[in-house]
Amino acid sequence: MRLRRKAWARPELESDPKVIYNPMQYKENWQEAFGNNHPIHLELGCGRGQFINQCAELNPHINYIAIDLYDEVLVKALRKINEKALHNVRVIPMNIAKLESIFKHDQIEKIYINFCNPWPSRRHHHKRLTHPQFLSVYKKLMKDHSEIWFKTDDDELFKDSLRYFAEEGFIEKYRTFDLHQSEFTENIKTEYEEKFSNQGVKIKFGIFEVNKG
């Protein structure tokens, strides 16, 4: 579903220094964007920002970068950041396919992929954020033994993604087909997750470790 463009969204984003429109300037030194050398965690497709805001609030010693393509949802994420006066989050409006242009190798310590588009049609599988063509890029940009945390409500996407991660040499550290009934205690819910779980949908979740061998 495409979001309706809001004319006010872009000016609001452009007026806030936490929104980075030229992220390539920090490719060699993301510490400059935050003013410290704390670890970098990345959320791909941050949506309205509930997840990354709670992460940042709980972990002030970690620098978070939220990426999404749509101004309309990024504005809502940014407002949450400002309401909580968080200083350890930056927002990037961009296509996730361009990640390699803004990060150098071995720079990211964790990636979160929450409820990405499942692209059910086989001819669109290459667009999935867990497809091997994306995973191979993430692996280069991430530090060895760092982790990708992946959540979805889609059974087929989760099943295929388990295979994708294995094909790309990731180590599966954790897997559950019903996150909210599992023993996992570190979960932070997204807006979509609350909606799906209230409808009785089981949330699938996995943790996959980068293994550069």
From Swiss-Prot:
PROSITE patterns: SAM_MT_TRMB (PS51625). GO terms for molecular function: tRNA (guanine(46)-N7)-methyltransferase activity. PANTHER family: 3-DEOXY-D-MANNO-OCTULOSONIC-ACID TRANSFERASE/TRNA GUANINE-N 7 - -METHYLTRANSFERASE (PTHR23417), PENTACOTRIPEPTIDE-REPEAT REGION OF PRORP DOMAIN-CONTAINING PROTEIN (PTHR23417:SF14). Substrate binds at D153, T190, E191, Y192, E193. This is tRNA (guanine-N(7)-)-methyltransferase. The lineage of its organism: Bacteria, Bacillati, Bacillota, Clostridia, Eubacteriales. Catalyzes the formation of N(7)-methylguanine at position 46 (m7G46) in tRNA. It catalyses: guanosine(46) in tRNA + S-adenosyl-L-methionine = N(7)-methylguanosine(46) in tRNA + S-adenosyl-L-homocysteine. S-adenosyl-L-methionine binds at E43, D68, N95, N117.
